[in-house]
């Protein structure tokens, strides 16, 4: 349920961010304010929660500082800048659809890193490979095979705010997709890096707070060097302010905390498997309310991505059941050992130095008991 709510937040950010960027807000400024609002929200919440529970905020040593700084650089600064540039140059539907290859990429990297197991002699192991290939092929077809237009008409794209400047229209789609693919790689690495970081720094709320703070500092440096126009730093409408605030609180502060918790419990691939839900929501709402065009190639590729994704999910289902059986067996073994240890424990001490009742008390109590009955 928590991961489903996160995908709803991401879908809202994708739609509203696309609309805000098209109307003139710089992608880099949007990311900066998003992370700043997330930091402003999460640190007081962290302080109040720790004060109420009387638990100190986890401090940072050199290793944890380096790991969190690296994760913030990959998962926030680089990832979000690439994603919003790609989102600006393509569409909301494309931005969410390309994210469907994140589970396949995450599974592949997790396998190479030793977090996922793969048995080529098992049909489920082969399903993981086939599903991964199908996901990648579907994503490529979405990019290269646009085909006939199914829904809505094409709208002009003002690209003066793009970091690339003015481009020909036929180049914007391909370059935007390249940005989106690069963003998915960064996000997959971010999910996988959560495993060693969570093991070394298990405080998920503090981890999210530090990531938001480091991301804000990094994004401020990037925006300072790339955004030369001082007017670009100003939020000119309530809709821009509301979008940045919503993205910061919902899609950064809260989602980072929940995802860190989910990854610690179920692993990075489990967290990545919920991305197709965001695609379905965004595609429907973008076509209905924002009149974004839908192409045949994108539709076929999207279906291929989702089919490949759930092929991988079916392949992973056996691993989940095996892990659950292993945990159940471990728990049964612990209970059995506990019972055996308890049976060897002396329950009653027979060698008392002094009797519990004296002879007089025992005789008097027996007589009283007989009189009552």
Swiss-Prot record:
Q: Does the keyword Iron apply?
A: no
* EamA domain sequence ranges: 9-135, 186-313
The record ties this protein, via Pfam families, to:
EamA
Q: Show the stretches that span the lipid bilayer.
A: 2-22, 29-49, 55-75, 94-114, 125-145, 173-193, 205-225, 244-264, 270-290, 294-314
- Topology versus the membrane: Multi-pass membrane protein
Entry keywords, A to Z: Membrane, Repeat, Transmembrane, Transmembrane helix
Q: Name one GO cellular component term.
A: membrane
Q: Which domain of life is it from?
A: Eukaryota
GO MF, one example: transmembrane transporter activity
Localization, UniProt: Membrane
Give the family from UniProt: Belongs to the drug/metabolite transporter (DMT) superfamily. Plant drug/metabolite exporter (P-DME) (TC 2.A.7.4) family.
Question: Which protein, by its recorded name, is this?
Answer: WAT1-related protein At4g30420
Q: Which organism is it from?
A: Arabidopsis thaliana
